[in-house]
From Swiss-Prot:
<dbReference type="InterPro" id="IPR013520">
    <property type="entry name" value="Exonuclease_RNaseT/DNA_pol3"/>
</dbReference>
<dbReference type="GO" id="GO:0000175">
    <property type="term" value="F:3'-5'-RNA exonuclease activity"/>
</dbReference>
<dbReference type="InterPro" id="IPR012337">
    <property type="entry name" value="RNaseH-like_sf"/>
</dbReference>
<protein>
    <recommendedName>
        <fullName>Oligoribonuclease</fullName>
        <ecNumber>3.1.15.-</ecNumber>
    </recommendedName>
</protein>
<comment type="similarity">
    <text>Belongs to the oligoribonuclease family.</text>
</comment>
<dbReference type="GO" id="GO:0005737">
    <property type="term" value="C:cytoplasm"/>
</dbReference>
<keyword id="KW-0540">Nuclease</keyword>
<dbReference type="GO" id="GO:0006259">
    <property type="term" value="P:DNA metabolic process"/>
</dbReference>
<dbReference type="Pfam" id="PF00929">
    <property type="entry name" value="RNase_T"/>
</dbReference>
<keyword id="KW-0963">Cytoplasm</keyword>
<feature type="domain" description="Exonuclease">
    <location>
        <begin position="8"/>
        <end position="171"/>
    </location>
</feature>
<comment type="function">
    <text>3'-to-5' exoribonuclease specific for small oligoribonucleotides.</text>
</comment>
<keyword id="KW-0269">Exonuclease</keyword>
<dbReference type="InterPro" id="IPR022894">
    <property type="entry name" value="Oligoribonuclease"/>
</dbReference>
<dbReference type="InterPro" id="IPR036397">
    <property type="entry name" value="RNaseH_sf"/>
</dbReference>
<feature type="active site">
    <location>
        <position position="129"/>
    </location>
</feature>
<dbReference type="GO" id="GO:0003676">
    <property type="term" value="F:nucleic acid binding"/>
</dbReference>
Amino acid sequence: MSFSDQNLIWVDLEMTGLDPETHKIIEIASIVTDSELNILAEGPVLAVHQPEEELVKMDDWCTNTHTSSGLVERVRNSDVSEQDAVAQTIEFLEKWVPKGVSPICGNSIGQDRRFLYKHMPELEEYFHYRYLDVSTLKELTRRWKPEVLDGFSKQGTHLALDDIRESIAELKYYRETIFKI
């Protein structure tokens, strides 16, 4: 185990929609890497229970995606509350990274942070105010060197842990092809 202020916290959420004011978190996962993007540990992967009245608010895309992945069933059967998910995730993070030092890392991570701020503020406060957003590099690559995008593809399972692993792999790909580090 390697507790360090250089470690990075990666997080991904699956939600019932895109609006944190009306939608809910239904899955959370986290991974800690070192500064070289080597995975040190995977945190708890938690389906967060939401009542049926929240699940019926999902649009067709969310309903189809989260049903086919098995997530909707996991959410229905889960006894993990949002607060339970916060406590378990923080308990994991405290073993690897001091509070307030790691940027929040992921793909389109600003969206996840909006949901954390609204529904899991104690967890949101664990991160530094900075972002390490892989989608920023993707957008710049799309504009400046689009042929590089052909060399990386994602499975797109829309399960939180898979999405984090893909984000880390994508950042490694950009490091090797664009930054040549």
